[in-house]
Amino acid sequence: MLYIHKDSMAKLAMFAFVYLFVILCACQGYSVSWGDASYYNQIGNVCFQTVLCVIAVLAFMYVKEDIFNIFAKIHLTKKETWIVVAVIGVLFFAFIGVVTVYRYLTYSNSTFDFGIFAQMYEYMKQKGTISTTVERNKLLSHFAVHFSPIFYIALPIYFIFDNAITVQLIQAFMVAIPVIPILLLCKHHKLSNQMAIAVSLIYVLYPATAGGTFYDIHENCFITFFLLMLAWAVEKKKNVAAVIFAILSLMVKEDAPVYVFILGIFFLFSKKDKKRGVILIVASAIYFAMATAIVNSYGLGIQEYRFGNLYFTQDGGLIQVFETLLANPGYAISQIIRNTNDNSMDKIGYIISMLVPVAAVLFTTGKKYSRYILLLPFIIINLLPTYLYMHDITFQYDFSVIALMMYAIILNIADMDINRAKKLATVSVIC
């Protein structure tokens, strides 16, 4: 056995070994078969990972004072903080880039959906139109399926590097770059340099952040950065920047206005900025009506069937979804935990995966209940439907929710005393 003279060093060594053991167990958990031919436990691995989080947190609580004493001796300047966050972003970009490019080079991508976007970018380069022959087995504009003009913003890069690998790296870049608005928001709310780095780590280590890239590029990957920049611009009262990032957010997809609308509602009811909140609400409602009208009139129609469990007739639509929410809220609430089928537990696993890692900093709003408004899309868009992929962290449907969650987390941490903030933020980083 090793003899370590100082008790604090012994504690830190213990924590390091425990945390390494937890990480190895977590990796092994993904290769374990949680059942047999007759029964498969869909949340076995999720529950296993949760238990590992508890073990890691208990180990941290035992050594937290020693860890905090070490970090208290580290004093970072503003410039050094930016450098550290930049390094975090670059490493995250490299990780996502390597994983997704490896998927492409090893023929692990599927035609649906990576083949669609790889062909679409080549068609954009050659013809200027956002068309594919893959998406619906005929030459068709992607606008017929999703109204996503945001794809054009990355076209200049594809002109220079016209390769399918570039398409994957565009996604990696857009998912890594939100560390910039996260740092800007942290500094605006006067979080310490170390706390700003911790929040950046919470973002990049959050399971759904990297998980959302594992089904390859989708337009959703653009929105995290734009929504966070929009929140920052509104808080700083930078009108030009707010307009630019609001427009860019809306351009991501026909359902993107929902998230801008929620931001507007939050600014209105939290009394942060009623005027700009109302503007966001009105602008997003108008854009939503326009985008859905375009897809419905000139395309194949918006994919409202994903909310089919809220229809009361077979050929329902969004109107019936709203009617169900208003007329039968009890039924609507029951759908939040209703799984895809009777033998599935996908929503339970999804809720655990999304909430456990950030619960320590997400549900500490005190009496500022308006912040829970930022969680409404998580409930309405991801949990209400029984469409399987909407509540799966390995698909792209969480990027908008992640942006709103990170914003709420920053607001919550800003209201905490320094000791509580350090403890809870570190717990979230560990998980």
Sequence positions of predicted segments:
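Hydrophobic, aromatic-rich transmembrane alpha-helices
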Residues: 1-2, 335, 346-372, 376-379
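Start-transfer (signal-anchor) and selected internal transmembrane alpha helices
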Residues: 1-98, 193, 276-279
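Hydrophobic/aromatic-rich transmembrane helices and adjacent perimembrane loops
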Residues: 41-53, 372-420
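Extracytosolic helix-loop segments that constitute the early lumenal/periplasmic catalytic or substrate-binding loops
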Residues: 116-141, 149
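Transmembrane-helix motifs of polytopic, lipid-linked glycan transferases
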Residues: 165-190, 229
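Specific aromatic-rich, kink-prone transmembrane helix
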Residues: 181-184, 202-205, 220-246, 263, ...
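Membrane-interface alpha helices of multi-pass inner-membrane proteins
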Residues: 199, 228-233, 240-268, 282-286
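Short acidic/glycine- and proline-prone juxtamembrane loop motifs at membrane-interface regions
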Residues: 211-220
